[in-house]
């Protein structure tokens, strides 16, 4: 008797079934590989591994992801002071936000809501709710507003290590006008760890982002939040988002302390001109405006000295320093390396907390 043929999705495959004791057996490798899965064998563990990738085409997957995530993205509108050529005046401001808690907490950009006197959140279904500002941190450009509504659909967060240049992403937000609420644009991750005049690193994307998209969601093809869309260069495909690792850091600080407890060294730092242009530099950070009671001054360092390392991690830009400081709290002790009079000296200092005015 000839071996039975095997079909996967209506197509015959090269693997034949085997009949033993009137029972039909089909080799899994051939079936799974024909279905687009990766099959591997671990000799040491004597186990088979099957990695099933998403079999949907882009034309099917993208609408599915948008449909899943869109209810978690909201529009934000409010009245407040706006600055223009003609001075300060009352106006209407708008942006986007992402639901992060079923009990009504919504994440957005700080610059979207910081000047709003009244805040209205408009859901995907068009329903509006008054909101209150709960947390804000302008250094990371993140804020949380809260509405009196429960049972909301929340966005899932991606893992930072899964954010890779070239991967496809979708931006969902409310560009330009509320008649375009929850618009979606598709693009790719263009770059990571971008420093573009902001205190912290950003994710770069070629996804179209415009006025009103700020505070919206940048998501991957698994429907997970990659970042909060924040800024871009007008008329280009060069746009940016606050990455999910910074989002997680800030939300954790909000939960623990009601604010982000930023670190202060009690001094201003000047980058090398190459670092200011985004060119790799090993010049360190020149100390300026050193306060007499600052941790660095207490360690006998002075203006004009150069900070080169913190806990043996080389520091060559302000963004690098700020990113490293996300691992510390005020009151922690760190070892700094400072070039003074042509010689690198090391000292343990206790970190201060940054004041609001710094």
Can you describe what each PLM-predicted range is?
Residues 70, 96, 102, 115, ...:
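Short, flexible surface segments
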Residues 94, 100-101, 123, 128, ...:
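Short, acidic, Ser/Thr-enriched surface-loop or helix-capping motifs
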Residues 1-55:
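Primary recognition of N-terminal secretory signal peptides and signal-anchoring hydrophobic helices
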Residues 80-83, 89-92, 208, 255-324, ...:
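PDZ/PDZ-like groove recognition
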Residues 56, 81, 101-179, 199-201, ...:
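Conserved active-site neighborhood of the chymotrypsin/trypsin-like protease fold
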Residues 71-76, 97, 104-108, 131, ...:
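Terminal peptide-recognition signature
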Residues 82-86, 90-92, 116-119, 152-154, ...:
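Active-site loop architecture of trypsin-fold serine endopeptidases
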Residues 53-86, 96, 118, 142, ...:
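N-terminal activation segment of mature serine protease catalytic domains
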């Amino acid at each position: 008797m000839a071996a039975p043929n095997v079909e996967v999705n209506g197509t015959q495959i090269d693997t034949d079934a085997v009949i033993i004791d009137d029972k039909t057996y089909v080799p899994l490798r051939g079936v799974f590989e024909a279905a687009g899965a990766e099959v591997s064998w671990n000799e040491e563990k004597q186990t088979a591994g099957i990695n099933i990738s998403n079999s949907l085409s882009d034309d099917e997957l993208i609408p599915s992801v948008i449909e899943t995530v869109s209810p978690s993205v909201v529009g934000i509108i409010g009245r407040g002071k706006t600055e223009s050529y003609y001075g300060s005046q009352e106006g209407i401001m708008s942006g986007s936000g992402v639901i992060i808690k079923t009990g009504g907490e919504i994440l957005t950009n700080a610059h979207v809501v910081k000047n709003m006197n009244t805040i209205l959140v408009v859901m995907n279904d068009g329903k509006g709710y008054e909101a209150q500002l709960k947390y804000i941190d302008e250094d990371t450009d993140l804020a949380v507003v809260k509405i009196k509504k429960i049972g909301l659909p929340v966005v899932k967060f991606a893992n930072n290590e899964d954010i890779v240049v070239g991967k496809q992403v979708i931006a969902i937000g409310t560009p330009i006008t509320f008649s375009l609420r929850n618009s979606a644009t598709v693009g790719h991750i263009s770059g990571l760890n971008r420093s573009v005049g902001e205190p912290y690193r950003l994710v770069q994307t070629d996804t179209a982002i415009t006025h009103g998209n700020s505070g919206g969601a940048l998501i991957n093809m698994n429907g997970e939040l990659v970042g909060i869309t924040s800024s871009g260069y007008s008329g280009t495909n060069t746009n940016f988002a606050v990455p999910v690792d910074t989002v997680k850091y800030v939300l954790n600080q909000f939960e623990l302390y009601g604010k982000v407890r930023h670190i202060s060294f009690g001094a201003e730092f000047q980058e090398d001109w190459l670092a200011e242009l985004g060119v790799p530099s090993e010049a360190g950070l020149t100390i300026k405006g050193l306060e007499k009671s600052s941790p660095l001054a207490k360690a006998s360092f002075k203006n004009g000295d150069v900070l080169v390392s913190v806990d043996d991690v080389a520091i060559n830009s302000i963004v690098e320093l700020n990113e490293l400081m996300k691992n510390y709290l005020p009151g922690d002790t760190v070892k700094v390396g400072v070039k003074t009079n042509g010689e690198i000296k090391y000292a343990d200092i206790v970190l201060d907390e940054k004041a609001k005015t710094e």
